[in-house]
């Protein structure tokens, strides 16, 4: 009894120590290493202490109950469960467990199927069941606090603890112990700790209402655009954007030595056409966010830390974008991506951005042309882009997202005879990563030449903007790169009709407006804003207000009603047709399927049943295993 009284008196201290140990275990799980967790704790002690205090604060509710041991174990188990979920996810993807994932937990089974085998799911379900059973036993058999529960004291003290932690959070942000801007969400989780980053991505989302937000303020912003000229009449050129995965100039890395220039074609184009640095919202990851800025003209800076609008607001509403704006001028909007359609949820998001067609890897006949990591090579994109241009009589807007340069880059040699060799990195493992990466972007550079050569002879006017979406995941620091800035790649604005060359650095959210301005198009609220207000006073402040109004506010810009309807987007450019079925072998029920526009992803379903399908070529498939009675 004396021991119980003693432990009750020092329960806060014991709880704090327990939370620190629990947090260390969580970080070890997330980092897949106790050594890395120890390094993190010893090199960033203030961040570690803050996150341990976060868990401690959530555990203060135990003082409102008698079964305090149970509630400590229950709250601790929830944190441990979240840590395990993140650890498992990071075994299968680069992005950690974030707010949007929490909101999708109701679809937990489908998420589990995506990342776990059937056996792993079974083991996980059994372990979860055992954990729940243990918690129930603890609930029934754990001792109760025998003293008097003083709610009039305990509740205010818990609230004081929560408020004090809020003050600590604000102080940590002011002193830059923490940050509320995540350039790379994976690195942010490593730098600022799992509890803080998870909570931030859950609660700090969207764009906060500006203090002076009102209808009159929006009208004032609109009035500042009045001096823009009208959109020129007549025909308009095809507008193409080519977003190159992790593409940047490795000669800018101070320590690298390369056997030859890996991007001679891109470099040549930069000298001959408009070019400059391209400011992007993230480092090492975040393709979809560079994409969002380039398509909509909106800056990610005003959204929540690490937020992906593709996973938040764009699931709920349409958004003003280049496809919607150009549609009013007769453009057809196409998206092209040599990866699966559901990557970043693009298949469901692109209709909310106004795209008319989406050609993903599943709709490409050459999707099986893979690099050593299994990503489809970018060379397959040339024909797909030209197909988009050929499919309509009027002008086209084509947004292409490449994938060949995607990581995670191998630390062991995987190329037998690399065309370009690399040295100078601090370790052999990093040299191997750079050598693999450099040879991939060298092939991407060849693709750039192939595409521009093909478009040079195209019978319609074309302007093509090419740029890297972010720097590669190589652990680069500002000291490592010649330009001393990690949030930028380079772009070139190529054309086949003689646009004047211009050297200018631009942000991703400014590029679409710049292209439209260069070809005489002055449409769209966001794009006109950039054209009229860039480099003027309060440019960023008013941009934040405008973005808030369009996505989260009362939409004064549209007189209170969003004018953009979700498009009925089709997958692929041309229909897939089935023309005939021929018997190959009656003994094992093998048949030829004749048709058009088949790809390696084609699957045959007849009368509600799926058949084993083998791709032969774009006009022929083989199905087998089941007898067809009537065809």
Regions found by a protein language model. Name each.
Residues 47, 99, 185-198, 284-285, ...:
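Membrane-interface micro-motifs in multi-pass membrane enzymes
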Residues 68, 88, 115-122, 142, ...:
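Short secondary-structure junctions and interdomain/linker hinges
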Residues 108, 239-244:
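Residue-level preference for non-acidic, small/hydrophobic
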Residues 118-119, 224-226, 317:
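N-terminal post-signal-peptidase region of extra-cytosolic proteins
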Residues 169-241:
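Membrane-interface segments at or immediately adjacent to transmembrane helices
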Residues 228-234, 244, 249-622, 627-631:
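Solvent-exposed soluble domains appended to multi-pass membrane proteins
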């Amino acid at each position: 009894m004396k021991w119980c009284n003693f432990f009750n008196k020092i329960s806060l201290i014991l709880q704090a120590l327990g939370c620190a140990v629990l947090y260390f275990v969580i970080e070890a799980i997330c980092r897949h290493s106790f050594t890395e967790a120890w390094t993190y704790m010893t090199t960033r002690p203030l961040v570690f202490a803050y996150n341990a205090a976060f868990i401690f604060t959530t555990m203060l509710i135990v003082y409102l109950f008698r079964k305090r041991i149970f509630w400590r174990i229950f709250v601790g188990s929830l944190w441990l469960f979240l840590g395990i979920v993140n650890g498992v996810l990071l075994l299968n993807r680069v992005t950690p467990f974030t707010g949007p994932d929490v909101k999708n937990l109701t679809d937990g089974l489908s998420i589990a199927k995506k990342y776990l085998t059937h056996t792993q799911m079974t083991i996980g379900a059994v372990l979860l069941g055992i954990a729940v059973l243990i918690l129930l036993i603890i609930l029934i058999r754990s001792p109760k606090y025998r003293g008097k529960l003083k709610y009039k004291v305990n509740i205010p003290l818990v609230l004081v603890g929560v408020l004090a932690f809020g003050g600590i959070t604000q102080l940590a942000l002011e002193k830059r112990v923490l940050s509320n801007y995540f350039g790379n969400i994976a690195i942010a989780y490593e730098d600022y700790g799992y509890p803080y980053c998870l909570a931030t991505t859950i609660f700090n989302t969207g764009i906060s209402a500006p203090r002076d937000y009102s209808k009159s303020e929006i009208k004032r912003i609109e009035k500042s655009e009045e001096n823009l000229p009208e959109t020129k009449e007549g025909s308009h050129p095809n507008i193409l954007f080519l977003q190159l995965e992790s593409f940047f100039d490795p000669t800018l890395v101070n320590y690298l030595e390369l056997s030859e220039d890996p991007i001679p074609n891109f470099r040549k184009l930069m000298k001959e056409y408009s070019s400059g640095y391209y400011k992007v919202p993230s480092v090492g990851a975040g393709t979809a966010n560079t994409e969002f800025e380039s398509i909509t003209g909106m800056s990610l800076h005003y959204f929540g830390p690490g937020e992906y609008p593709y996973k938040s607001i764009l699931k709920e509403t349409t958004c003003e974008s280049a496809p919607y704006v150009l549609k009013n001028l007769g453009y057809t909007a196409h998206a092209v991506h040599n990866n699966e359609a559901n990557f970043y949820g693009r298949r469901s998001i692109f209709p909310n951005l106004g795209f008319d067609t989406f050609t993903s890897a599943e709709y490409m006949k050459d999707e099986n042309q893979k690099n050593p990591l299994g990503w489809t090579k970018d060379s397959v994109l040339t024909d797909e882009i030209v197909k988009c241009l050929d499919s309509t009589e009027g002008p086209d807007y084509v947004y292409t997202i490449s994938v060949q340069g995607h990581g995670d880059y191998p630390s062991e040699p995987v190329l037998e005879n690399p065309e370009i060799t690399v040295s100078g990195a601090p370790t052999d493992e990093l040299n191997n990563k750079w050598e693999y990466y450099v040879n991939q972007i060298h092939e991407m550079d060849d693709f750039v030449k192939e595409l521009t050569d093909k478009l040079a002879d195209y019978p319609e006017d074309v302007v093509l903007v090419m740029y890297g979406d972010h720097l590669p995941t190589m652990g680069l620091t500002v000291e490592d790169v010649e330009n001393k800035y990690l949030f930028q790649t380079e772009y070139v604005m190529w054309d086949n009709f003689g646009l004047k060359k211009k050297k200018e650095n631009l942000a991703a959210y400014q590029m679409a407006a710049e292209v439209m301005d260069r070809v005489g198009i002055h449409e769209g609220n966001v794009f006109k804003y950039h054209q009229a207000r860039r480099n003027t006073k309060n440019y960023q402040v008013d941009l934040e207000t405008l973005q808030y109004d369009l996505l989260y506010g009362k939409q004064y810009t549209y007189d209170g009603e969003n004018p953009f309807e979700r498009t009925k987007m089709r997958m692929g450019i041309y229909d897939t047709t089935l023309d005939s079925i021929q018997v190959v072998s009656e003994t094992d029920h093998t048949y030829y399927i004749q048709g058009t526009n088949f790809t390696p992803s084609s699957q045959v379903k007849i009368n509600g049943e799926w058949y084993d399908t083998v791709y032969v070529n774009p006009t022929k498939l083989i199905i087998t295993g089941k007898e067809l009675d009537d065809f």
